[in-house]
Amino acid sequence: MAEEQVLNTHNASILLSAANKSHYPQDDLPEIALAGRSNVGKSSFINTILGRKNLARTSSKPGKTQLLNFFNIDNKLRFVDVPGYGYAKVSKSERAKWGKMIEEYLTSRDNLRAVVSLVDLRHAPSKEDIQMYDFLKYYDIPVIVVATKADKIPRGKWNKHESVVKKALNFDKSDTFIVFSSVERIGIDDSWDAILEQV
């Protein structure tokens, strides 16, 4: 695999969790942020593309990630898992705090190279999904849209669902769109190609 010549993706560990920029790692390693609705499958995406079972903790309780979680990959790259948005059971003030923390990271972090924006292929994007995509486009942050849970839809319907997602996002053709399934391990190579192109 091409990416393994560049970095050993299995040499990965959680580095730290941060609530604000004073806690961010102080070096110049490139970072890829991962954003998406609660329960869209961010932890499964991280575990699957890194070939690890439990590096990022998956949870049946949405809204579990409450800090920015930095993952070190072979001392050459970092993934930054940001809190999942759109979870109703979190208080408004808590959501506002998360929003501020995410915005501060996305708009001020020099290490950031791109954002993997995860959406659920089964459903039209939520209002928050669309806001996130628009936010990234506004700030000119490279975005890779990964549509998860493809295994829950018959393959013959993937194109139809992809069209629905792209239309709702007003998807920019210059961005990358990847159909992904952690269960069937679909989209791993495409995800790495898109990520490594940005770093």
UniProtKB/Swiss-Prot annotation:
Start and end residues of each EngB-type G domain: 28-199
Cofactors required: Mg(2+)
Domain of life: Bacteria
Binding locations of GTP: 36-43, 63-67, 81-84, 148-151, 180-182
Annotated residues for binding of Mg(2+): 43, 65
A GO-annotated cellular component: cytosol
InterPro entries in the record: G_ENGB_dom, GTP-bd, GTP-bd_ribosome_bio_YsxC, P-loop_NTPase, Small_GTP-bd
Gene Ontology BP, a term: division septum assembly
Molecular function, one GO term: GTP binding
Similarity annotation: Belongs to the TRAFAC class TrmE-Era-EngA-EngB-Septin-like GTPase superfamily. EngB GTPase family.
PANTHER family from the UniProt entry: ENGB-TYPE G DOMAIN-CONTAINING PROTEIN, MSS1/TRME-RELATED GTP-BINDING PROTEIN
Described purpose of this protein according to its UniProt entry: Necessary for normal cell division and for the maintenance of normal septation.
Protein's name according to its UniProt entry: Probable GTP-binding protein EngB
Native source species: Streptococcus pyogenes serotype M5 (strain Manfredo)
